[in-house]
């Protein structure tokens, strides 16, 4: 006997009524508003029960079988969010996912109530999955099946998109539809940013006592490693970026000696690499390293650092998800442009209470694709002139989009991320 994938809304209502999943609950007597726990998987206080609703949907929908499939929390979470976002009867009312004490999201039904979505028949068939049907959603499926909707682009379509990038003007346009260009024919070009085989390009700038002494652009599998001028371990991953000997640029011998001492403690170096939507860092030597997000011209030295790069494990230093959300808000005029420049202070504490130029070794790392995205947003909102932007990642091509299309592609990119 065949099985049918349960409908997300009747299934979710059933879970809410049962009240067995931690933090998943109705918020009003009319059963129109409910909350879902939304803790990030990388938080140190994350527990298995924080993600029970995502795993439950993965099991019910047949995407995950315990004991057979490998657990994949980001995919479970992304699929659950995408399933809810596709339902017009539901909307995100409040987003508290970044609340440090109780991260959650509040959804509400915009129809007359949950009576429009009867609970499923939760009897199990031989496979152990739910067998259910829903008249309301079945009618929607029939309506959609009669429309000419292109399927998602596969590998062949993606190849075509890379060989023939869209040539559209980057300008505000009332005539342009607010959707990614020809998504049925070619993949959203911005999704290259998350591709496992596409490496970001980084511009590395080194300062000794506030003086720029070095700049290099790096694009390499495995990311990069900031290493001292002495010989380093070539067996480690990441392209080594060798910081120059201070004697070539500093006239003060005493300062040069101190800088050289910092470089000698770098050991295997400071590793920086991308995995999915995150940039990760780890120090492989004895030299302590502090980091913070700042402007391209100067670090945010008037405040505390965002953190210290860990030695015994990797630490996240940048999340593309909030950056894209802030970029959309910037395009809409509701906030300033998001920051994307990483500053690292090596061998000394972060310059919180004094000028950053007093520090011996400061390194600035700019992900060039993020600079391109911000430049694209600025140009699209400030000018009607055509502009072509290179994302500065491997296998990328010059990209041109209208302002509306660009914003829609950014929103589409957010759907593929884990929050």
From Swiss-Prot:
Positions bearing Phosphothreonine: 3, 75, 235, 251, 402
Q: Where is this cross-link: Glycyl lysine isopeptide (Lys-Gly) (interchain with G-Cter in ISG15)?
A: 191, 358, 364
* Main location (coarse class): cytoplasm
Where in the cell?
Cytoplasm; Nucleus; Mitochondrion
Q: Where is this site: Cleavage?
A: 121-122, 125-126
GO biological process entries: cellular response to virus; defense response to virus; immune system process; innate immune response; positive regulation of DNA-templated transcription; positive regulation of interferon-alpha production; positive regulation of interferon-beta production; positive regulation of type I interferon production
Alphabetically ordered keywords of this record: Acetylation, Activator, Antiviral defense, Cytoplasm, Disulfide bond, DNA-binding, Host-virus interaction, Immunity, Innate immunity, Isopeptide bond, Mitochondrion, Nucleus, Phosphoprotein, Transcription, Transcription regulation, Ubl conjugation
Q: Where is this region: Disordered?
A: 118-137
Write down the SUPFAM superfamilies for this protein, in alphabetical order.
SMAD/FHA domain (SSF49879), Winged helix' DNA-binding domain (SSF46785)
* Sequence segments annotated as region (Interaction with HERC5): 198-358
Task: List residues, modification N6-acetyllysine.
Answer: 364
Instruction: Kindly give the Pfam families that the UniProt entry links to this protein.
Output: IRF, IRF-3
DNA-binding region spans which residues? 5-111
Can you list the GO cellular component terms from the UniProt entry? Answer: mitochondrion; nucleus
**Residue span of region Mediates interaction with ZDHHC11:** 140-419
Q: Which family does it belong to?
A: Belongs to the IRF family.
Q: Protein name, please?
A: Interferon regulatory factor 3
